[in-house]
Amino acid sequence: MGIKNLKSLLLENKSLTILDDNLYKVYNGIFVDTMSIYIAVANCVRNLEELTTVFIKYVNGWVKKGGHVTLFIDRGSIKIKQNVRDKRRKYSKSTKDRKMLELEKCTSKIQNVTGFMEEEIKAEIQLKIDKLTFQIYLSDSDNIKISLNEILTHFNNNENVTLFYCDERDAEFVMCLEAKTYFFTTGEWPLIISTDQDTMLFASVDNHPKMIKNLTQLFKFVPSAEDNYLAKLTALVNGCDFFPGLYGASITPTNLNKIQLFSDFTINNIVTSLAIKNYYRKTNSTVDVRNIVTFINDYANLDDVYSYIPPCQCTVQEFIFSALDEKWNDFKSSYLETVPLPCQLMYALEPRKEIDVSEVKTLSSYIDFENTKSDIDVIKSISSIFGYSNENCNTIVFGIYKDNLLLSINSSFYFNNSLLITNTKSDNIINIGY
């Protein structure tokens, strides 16, 4: 649930570590994302009675460790979550159909069991039938709400348990918002219990240590500004509840070491992080990049985005080139696209030294509007005359690639209005810098 791969990425980045749950007996309060835990428990049991027993046992165990438990409970409809609900209904129906087919097979199979260990085999199949029947029952969201509300009545008179209803906002969002307030009062975050990976995005909002738990594991999370950036970048690329992500891209533990991470979640930094491979513009579509980045930023910072209109999905290419369009359009005022490359270069370069008369004559000799082929030695000579180098550059201003003049950002990648080339794959690019 939530942001795909975020937990594994934070583990890979070493800010999230797994602890031995048995070594930690006492907490300064416990906050629970109720629905996520309830569903996790429901997937492990066979009937409502067992679900009730196990869930109550968990809560009572948390009370012993935390003194007081606050159960954050989703309530009401979240308007901006309609697309997510539609997808979940579709997925739920598909899952229900698959489980019903599996149930039919098990029902048929149990009737035909005979011979050696007949009773044991039937008992095993019956357990599977019971579990499938219960899972089909819970595939109806109304049944989930009814059964959860029934279980919660067991805590109505329990002074150690608070039921906190989150009207028209996600429980994990409200939980982390309240946990942040709790920190300002007590100087410590409560233990956060959730299976939703959005929780780790919200928990990265400050650099104070947190303890986060799901049903089976306990984590310590000490986020840096870089981890907060990584969490936001993962929400942007891989998607979250309110933004489907950048189609055609994914951040995984495998490619994380190729991605530059920063402290500030800015458009320039985001594009630099995404530039781990070459991209080519496939359409002329542009997207409102600032709106997307603002939404992710506000959501991650626990600002109330529930009145926003969530941004639509776009491809990673549309995001990248829309983000770079402003810089390219600014550059076009000093760019002559229709003349040969040496002339383009002379027009675009800002002199970094005085150019003497003999050098002007040399430059003049390079002006040949009929010759469309570029000579590497000519390119290097022009660069040198203007005070630039082609080797060992600390700052790269331009790159020359197949007669294309490309801009460079952070010396990390090159681009124009139709292609982006990463600096890690730039053996056939001539650098111009200083």
UniProtKB/Swiss-Prot annotation:
A family per Pfam: Pox_G5
Induction of its expression: Expressed in the early phase of the viral replicative cycle.
Protein name, UniProt field: Putative nuclease OPG089
Cofactor dependence: Mg(2+)
Similarity remark: Belongs to the XPG/RAD2 endonuclease family. FEN1 subfamily.
Cofactor binding, note field: Binds 2 magnesium ions per subunit. They probably participate in the reaction catalyzed by the enzyme.
Native organism taxonomy: Viruses, Varidnaviria, Bamfordvirae, Nucleocytoviricota, Pokkesviricetes
Keyword line: DNA damage, DNA repair, Early protein, Hydrolase, Magnesium, Metal-binding, Nuclease, Virion
Enzyme Commission number(s): 3.1.-.-
Species this protein is from: Variola virus (isolate Human/India/Ind3/1967) (VARV)
Name of the gene this protein is made from: OPG089
